[in-house]
Swiss-Prot record:
Organism superkingdom: Bacteria
Pfam families: PrmA
Entry protein name: Ribosomal protein L11 methyltransferase
Root EC class: transferase
Organism per entry: Streptococcus pyogenes serotype M18 (strain MGAS8232)
Keywords: Cytoplasm, Methyltransferase, S-adenosyl-L-methionine, Transferase
Location relative to the cell: Cytoplasm
General function of this protein: Methylates ribosomal protein L11.
Family, as annotated: Belongs to the methyltransferase superfamily. PrmA family.
Length: 317
């Protein structure tokens, strides 16, 4: 029986996305995230009851490596990369690293124990595909089986993207989802009434996973997934373009986004740590967009821009 090595890194939740990327880059076959915040604060907003969980700013990110991996070298590299992230201003927190061996059948499903149904916005709830869930009246359920290499839809950057889509979409829109990952934003767009959604990702694995997740959800035949490098070569105009990726990548798509967004349409940009906020704002303003909404959760920012001639109540351009 093949065994796997499990490495758990305890960091501040604001570093979740960056640290997950570090773990994948060091050879992990996937990551699982345990965050008490996924269960805290939902009761007051939506009236549901959740288990009592002690809230902490720290989260546990567990990575899985083949048994042949030199774990000492991997852990040394992880510590070096985390120190570098901290030097860039990202709030990493007090880092601790644990490791253990894991049998293959445990590795295959171990990450699932951290993944529970989560009410993300007023209308949208993300539910693991293997979970039976009774939706309440008006509740829109997104079924996901992201695998270990993709987020479960509960990261602040995803939450803010979903909230923005819920506020903007009224039915009949064309949406472009750049860097679709698990496909969660495309699925949400369909459930919120968008007529047609085009989802792009540079990663072939993401394209496959997104399509598999789309197939889990009824009424999502209007989502078209394809490999693509941001918006290069795209000619389809859209009412809404949404991208939840790193800030350094977001600044590369603002000009193409302005070309493709229809008049009075929207550009939603998320995945922006506070230190990179001005850089993204400058790129979007230079492209011609006006800022309509700025959302903040911890160190993360999401921005909603509009392509308009009516500049009352908006900033930039």
């Amino acid at each position: 029986m093949e065994t796997w090595q499990e490495v758990t890194v305890h960091v501040h939740r604001d570093a979740q996305e960056a640290v997950s990327h570090v773990l994948i880059e060091t050879g992990s076959q996937g990551v699982a995230i345990a965050d008490s915040a996924d269960y805290i604060g939902q009761k007051d907003r939506f009236g549901e009851l959740y288990p009592d969980v002690e809230q902490s700013d720290m989260i546990a990110i567990t990575a899985y490596y083949p048994s042949s991996t030199n774990l000492a070298d991997v852990i040394a590299t992880i510590n070096e990369q985390l120190a570098e992230l901290a030097s860039f201003g990202l709030q990493v927190g007090q880092v601790t690293v644990d490791s253990q061996e894991l049998a293959e059948e445990d590795w295959a499903d171990n990450w699932k124990k951290y993944y529970e149904p989560a009410r993300i916005t007023h209308d949208l709830t993300i539910v693991p595909s293997w979970t039976d869930y009774d939706a309440s009246a008006g509740e829109k359920v997104i079924k996901l089986d992201p695998g270990m290499a993709f987020g479960t839809g509960t990261h602040p950057t995803t939450k803010m993207s979903l909230f923005a889509l819920e506020q903007i979409l009224r039915g009949g829109e064309t949406v472009i989802d750049v860097g679709t990952g698990s496909g969660v934003l495309s699925i949400a767009s369909s459930l919120l009434g968008a007529k047609t959604i085009y989802a792009y990702d540079l990663d072939d694995v993401a394209v496959r996973v997104a399509q598999e997740n789309i197939d889990l959800n009824q009424g999502t035949d209007n989502i078209h997934v394809a490999a693509g490098d941001l918006l290069k070569g795209v000619s389809q105009e859209a009412d809404v373009i949404v991208a939840n990726i790193l800030a350094d990548i977001l600044v590369l798509l603002t000009d193409d986004a302005y070309r493709l967004v229809k008049k009075e349409g929207y550009l939603i940009l998320s995945g922006i740590i506070s230190e990179k906020l001005d850089m993204v704002l400058e790129a979007a303003f230079s492209a011609g967009f006006f800022l309509e909404t700025h959302m903040i959760q911890g160190e993360w920012n999401a921005l909603v821009f509009k392509k308009t001639d009516d500049i009352s109540g908006v900033i930039g351009g």
